[in-house]
Amino acid sequence: MNMPQRKDCGMQIAGPVDQPVTSELVVLREMLNFEGARLLELGCGAAEKTRLIAERTGISAMVAAEVDRIQHAKNLEIRDLPKVTFAAFGAESIEAPDESFDIIILFKSLHHVPAALLDQSFAEMFRVLKPGGHVYISEPVFEGEFNEVIRLFNDEEVVRKGAFAAIGRAIESGQFQLVEERFFRNVVKLASFAQFEQGLINVTHSERNVSPALLVRIRERFESFRKPEGFVFEVPNRVDLLVKR
């Protein structure tokens, strides 16, 4: 498979002020060659990105793994994605043979791996990747209006820094090489606070423990970002594309 080669670019946890506004699918297609690939997605959540990849790229097969057992049970009810196999395991213990995938993708999930298991997770990714295989790591950047709302009940600054440091260690270890680091913003449009609450507070993969008083603060901050067109946020992201050496 023809893949992009390494560019000499330093790693940064946050990007420049001016960034393109685009979708993750556009970035994926620009950075990866999916044709005929066997793909592993770690932390597939409700399988939104899983569906996009399965339906809009040329992959041959895909394993979509999720550690949240409640969400995994829901994913198993999906019947219209014949290329996809849903599985229940984490990045630190990938249930797959050695050198069995061309591409591994993590959408906003690396920072959810426990800090003590991050290095083990990269060792597992190295194990199951084919020689020359790629790891696409998309992480949210800890800044912006959307982040200002979320941090009130889910402050991820420390774990995101830990995930970023783990990427650096994986490169320094010689297992992986950095191909490219890219920054972009994606647009999140929400109709109401109720939609925000349902999608980000009332989740099954984490216990938010949001008190009534805190919920009022979250709502107030969310409402403060209302625009004429509604609740529209440009969310900053960082993608690190690695290749197995």
Label for each model-derived stretch:
Residues 2-27:
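Class I SAM-dependent methyltransferase Rossmann-like catalytic core
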